[in-house]
């Protein structure tokens, strides 16, 4: 399953996959992050969320990894999703890496997204985090992802941790 922007819902199209080829990202870290964002998008779509935008950017403000729509019976919710991946460390897991400063940047970018997409003004909004905690793995026969900058290292991918309502904002 591929994640493409839903052109019926988004007023400004974002071409993340040109001619079915991924964008050329400059660093191995960016390429790896893009793969985890793709996995998170597929994970959320399997749970019924609809992709509105992926890698939405506002210059000098910030980026939103995923913007999803969760349709409910009474109302729908616009979900701003931050995707984080971190290898096992003693400094905390992937979810903890979404600092207060990062939360402020995401909230600011979400405000700009809503200003540029007035069709979502009346929606409830929620800020979620999808966290992937990975470990280096020695068995090369198992399903894994190869690190771009370290071809002999492989990551063991755990199920994502989906933190719904991971943080809130006091007022829009």
UniProtKB/Swiss-Prot annotation:
Classification via InterPro entries: Restrct_endonuc-II-like (IPR011335), tRNA_endonuc-like_dom_sf (IPR011856), UPF0102_YraN-like (IPR003509)
Record GO terms (molecular function): nucleic acid binding
Source organism superkingdom: Bacteria
Family, as annotated: Belongs to the UPF0102 family.
PANTHER family associated with the record: UPF0102 PROTEIN YRAN
Protein's name according to its UniProt entry: UPF0102 protein Pcryo_2198
Annotated source species: Psychrobacter cryohalolentis (strain ATCC BAA-1226 / DSM 17306 / VKM B-2378 / K5)
């Amino acid at each position: 399953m591929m994640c493409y922007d839903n052109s019926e819902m988004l007023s400004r199209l974002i071409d993340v996959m040109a001619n079915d080829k991924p964008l050329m990202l400059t660093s191995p870290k960016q390429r790896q992050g893009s793969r985890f964002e793709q996995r998170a998008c597929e994970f959320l779509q399997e749970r019924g969320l609809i992709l509105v935008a992926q890698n939405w950017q506002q210059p000098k403000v910030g980026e939103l990894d995923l913007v999803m729509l969760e349709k409910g019976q009474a109302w729908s919710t616009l979900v701003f999703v931050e995707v984080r991946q971190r290898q096992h460390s003693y400094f905390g897991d992937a979810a903890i890496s979404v600092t207060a400063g990062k939360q402020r940047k995401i909230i600011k970018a979400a405000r700009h997204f809503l200003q540029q997409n007035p069709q979502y003004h009346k929606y409830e909004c929620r800020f979620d985090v999808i966290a992937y905690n990975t470990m280096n793995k020695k068995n090369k026969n198992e399903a894994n992802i190869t690190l771009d900058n370290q071809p002999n290292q492989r990551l063991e991918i755990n199920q994502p941790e989906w933190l719904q309502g991971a943080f809130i904002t006091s007022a829009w």
